[in-house]
């Protein structure tokens, strides 16, 4: 009996050993092979950084007409007239009729409704001069004023395609966008032809009041305004050239958005450093506001000023090239620093005054932009 038990134990152990050996052989048939492992290599790269560009050029020019706001009326007789340095209007004196009503006085050819700004308007022979001025600038040829370096933001996406002729160099395609501002201003003193229209009125032998004067001038309920004869005695016009008579200020502000697409080349240098190059087409969308302010100080009266503004935009096709040095911080992120050149053409923007007499232009040239770019890159 003991012999039988021992025989059964030996048989059971042998059977277990045989089963274990078969199981191990079975598992061994399905061991993973090296060929079954998949290694994922990132093909896309996103770059986010800044772009600083110089080389934008602007130029300003044109011609303008500045005139004081006035209404001259008829060149003879009695009329309401407004000048740059005063006015002569219809008489506003009244008297009280028997019924106690205020009624206009019987016309006597004079008026209390007048005024002037400068003491030089009173002449030695007892007359008063009133003036209207017009300054017509000589054509201002285009004056160049280049904007300073403009910094903006850029974003691009790159797709790796493959190796170049079996080498370690790789090529791909890239697309991106960036935005940079345009801001520049300049000023110049322009020569101008000054046309002065002078109207003469009589004070009837009395002295002119102290300038500046505005009538009617009631004092204690009694109108003591010095009177001037309403009839225009004489009108004359004179034109003379004046050097640096008109101050013009030109200002341009805006931005341009660049969309680019092209091919890229990746050249490994070391384990962490590499060089990258790209070139392709670019489409720039530029939007700018052009402001012009002019001023002219005549002999009498306040400074004559005029301001005008216009907004414009343009689509400018062109090309770009850039070269970059890249540093890999790890397998999926890195830094880049490079140089860029972009040519996007030019356009002309014009601004015209409300009366259509002044017209100035600015030429915006984006055909030779160059600068630096830097930022971070992420692969996925």
Please place each PLM-identified region on the residue numbering:
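Cleavable N-terminal export/targeting peptides
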Residues: 1-40
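Outer-membrane beta-barrel "beta-signal"
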Residues: 23, 366-380
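Surface-exposed strand-loop-strand hairpins of Gram-negative outer-membrane beta-barrel proteins
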Residues: 53-150, 314
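Extracellular/periplasm-exposed beta-strand and loop segments of Gram-negative cell-envelope proteins
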Residues: 59-63, 120-148, 181-255, 285-316, ...
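Transmembrane beta-barrel architecture of outer-membrane proteins
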Residues: 148-154, 170, 254-260, 274-276, ...
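Residues on the lipid-exposed face of transmembrane beta-strands in outer-membrane beta-barrel proteins
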Residues: 153-159, 175-177, 259-267, 279-283, ...
